[in-house]
Amino acid sequence: AYAGNLAVTTTSGPGLSLKSEAMGLAVMAELPLVVVDVQRGGPSTGLPTKTEQSDLNQALFGRNGECPMAVIAAHSPAHCFDAAFQAAKIALEHMTPVMLLSEGFLGNGSEPWKIPSMKDYPEIKPPFVQGILPEGEKFRPFERDPETLVRRWALPGQRGFEHRVGGLEKNHAGVLSTDPANHALMVAERAEKVARIARDLPVLTMQHGPASGALLVVGWGGTFGHILTAVREIGAAVTESSLIIRHP
């Protein structure tokens, strides 16, 4: 990712724990990374061939320090493609690692799927630096876009944009800093940057039932089909039931 490309890795089970340090580094360095976690029964080696949704809390919170990440969950075998595209777009445009949750049920599942045309998908626009710096001006790698709080992405070898990244805290100029006030500022900016990703997400839509009613069922991930079936079956008894699938 430091060299100017999206970094992607996949894992399952305790492999996610082993990658937590690298994810923290990507959060601190603010570089695009997608981690795909095909969840299985745990803990430890657990049930390698059986499905589970037990990694959600680790995906949301399983890193040291204040280390927020975007998390997306696929809900069907076909949806894995769109979820992966969304994860890549978020990572590249917001300069952040993203966790994509799948699970054994989806990994071993199948369904008819029409291969899409990429022209039907929105353009991905990474925040690469453009042009050259004015004479005497130094590149400040952690200065942010005022709307998105995303930093600019300078590639190694770009003249005038030399800078350092790494796991140590830095200020906006990219200089190492242990100043408490600067640390508080950078922690807050990184968290708010991730929170503002929600501005670019589509509005949630009702998958079944009326837009309002007495009962709302919320689910996530591969339980989508089961929940949808259950809501449809109880629809005769609970006429105001609705289903919405929320991607964390």
Protein language model annotation of sequence segments:
Residues A1-F61, A70-A91, A236:
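Thiamine diphosphate
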Residues G4-A7, E66-A73, S212-L216, I245:
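Glycine- and acidic
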Residues E21, F61-N64, S110-E111, M118:
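Short capping/connector residues at structural and topological boundaries
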Residues A83, A88-P248:
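Flexible, low-complexity linker and terminal segments
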